[in-house]
Amino acid sequence: SFIWLQRRQALQINGMNRELETANEFLATLSMKISRYLSPQIYKSIFSGQRDVVIQTERKKLTIFFSDIKDFTATTERLQPEQITRLLNEYFTEMSAIALKHGGTIDKFVGDAMLIFFGDPESRGEAEDAAARLRLALDMQHRVAELNVKWRNEGIEHPFRVRMGVNTGYCNVGNFGSADRMDYTIIGAEANLAARLQSIAEAGHVVVSYETYALVRRMIEA
């Protein structure tokens, strides 16, 4: 009868709606898991449709930050693998929170090193990007000092000594790689200079290039 057909259709529609809800929940969960492998700014620009996942780069003026842990190899030799893994993950967790607070784009972790940049995909202007970068570095050094006190109280005799380098200049930024596997990263001489500045910094200090210094001179002198 007609009423029976209506009920049958209603049941079918309800079943389809439940399947769609389940599928949407699965996709939302999967999306959140994938987001852990991307900087939040990049993730949002991709999933909002603002950015295509294609091999494409553009030239932009960025402020680039490199850091690493001085004598990290020697530190790993003094500690058990489980200890160094715990400390490194805690360190990266704290540093990442500071980077995101200041609006930095976390490019990658390489061993004990971090690469972060300002100016893409969001920018507040050259001077403000550079100032945010400097505030980030100072906040990180302060937090590392606090972590070292905590770790010494836990019996870690020689915790992390972090050195940092900051530079401002033009880089190519975007998706590099192949159609099957790509990274959103930066490439260029200015990024290499930031890495070199980090390598000459003393532990617990930040070395800033003249280009960055010129943008934040008033902040430093104040």
Task: Set out the residue ranges of the language-model regions.
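Cytosolic regulatory/linker segments at or just downstream of nucleotide-handling modules
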Residues: 171, 200-222
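Catalytic NTP-binding/metal-coordinating core of nucleotidyl cyclase/transferase enzymes
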Residues: 28-30, 52-135
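Catalytic strand-loop-helix junctions within cyclic-nucleotide turnover domains
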Residues: 117-128, 164-182, 203-205
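Short, surface-exposed loop/helix-turn segments at secondary-structure junctions
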Residues: 154-156, 176-188
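Regulatory cytosolic signal-relay segments
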Residues: 3-59, 220-221
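Alpha-helical scaffold within the catalytic cores of cyclic-nucleotide enzymes
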Residues: 89-104, 120-164, 189-191, 195-198
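Acidic/histidine metal-binding catalytic segments
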Residues: 110-111, 152-163, 205-212
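Helical mechanochemical/support elements of P-loop NTPase systems and associated helical scaffolds
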Residues: 42, 84, 91, 110, ...
